[in-house]
Design a protein with these regions (language model features):
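Alpha-to-beta junction loops
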Residues: 67-71, 156-164, 177
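Short, solvent-exposed loop/beta-turn-alpha elements that line the ligand-binding surface or hinge
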Residues: 2-9, 92-124, 186-194
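Extracytoplasmic "Venus flytrap"/periplasmic binding protein-like
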Residues: 1-9, 16, 41-52, 152-153, ...
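Glycine-centered hinge/linker elements that transmit conformational signals in sensory
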Residues: 61-63, 104-143
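A local structural motif
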Residues: 46-50, 130-145, 158, 175-178
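Extracytoplasmic/periplasmic substrate-recognition and gating elements
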Residues: 46, 135, 173-204
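Hinge/lid segment of periplasmic solute-binding proteins
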Residues: 1-34, 85, 181-182
Length: 204
């Protein structure tokens, strides 16, 4: 339970589901991808190309704005959505040599020193977030958007893209909305999806 891998797991699982010899048996579970849920019907209606990189993503947001449709938003009333957006936009930095070094130290359960944000990885990450806010037209009003607000905008054709779970694709397809899923487009050309387990299972 003192390894980096175990340090990333909720302690209650490690403490309460042990075998008699102290070991823990784990079952792998599926991951839930997070990225951009996209209304393809709106792209086709307004003849706007689906984004393939960061530049075309920004162009799509601007094109939708011109026809009175919101290009992008998310349920930013929840702090975790803000944090996940920052992480997704910063995937390139966090996966760099410096980024991996910072993450290893930050998540090390043996590290007794409080580890804050460093001065190498995070300034660039926050600059990227600031640029993203400007490019997508996010404003103070978006901090009041909850999940229901976003879903209603999307269903009513007032929103083309939002940051969310891949589960949203199936949900909207079942409602007859032609929906697809796009990754985080990095400004360096890379494409990333965030994945998180729905839950973790320990057996004893």
């Amino acid at each position: 339970s003192t390894t980096n891998a175990a340090g990333a797991v909720y302690d209650t699982y490690l403490s309460n589901f042990r075998n008699e010899d102290g070991s823990v048996n784990w079952l792998p579970v599926c991951a839930d991808a997070h990225g951009f849920v996209v209304n393809k019907d709106l792209f086709e209606k307004y003849d706007i190309p689906l984004p393939t990189d960061y530049e075309s993503f920004v162009s799509a947001c601007q094109a939708f704005d011109k026809v009175g449709v919101r290009g992008f938003t998310a349920d930013y009333s929840y702090d975790y959505t803000c944090m996940e957006t920052l992480q997704g936009l910063s995937a390139s930095e966090l996966s760099s040599v410096d980024g991996r070094k910072w993450r290893t130290i930050y998540s090390d359960p043996d590290n007794t020193k409080r580890e804050g944000l460093d001065s190498t990885v995070w300034p660039e990450a926050f600059e990227r977030m600031e640029q993203f806010i400007q490019d997508t037209g996010l404003s103070q009003d978006d901090l009041d958007m909850n999940y229901d607000d976003v879903v209603e905008m999307y269903k009513s054709g007032k929103l083309a893209m939002y940051f969310g779970s891949s589960a949203g694709v199936k949900m909207f397809q079942d409602q007859g909305i032609n929906t697809t899923f796009l990754p985080f487009f990095q400004q360096n050309g890379e494409k990333w999806l965030m994945t998180t387990p729905y839950f973790q299972i320990a057996l004893n």
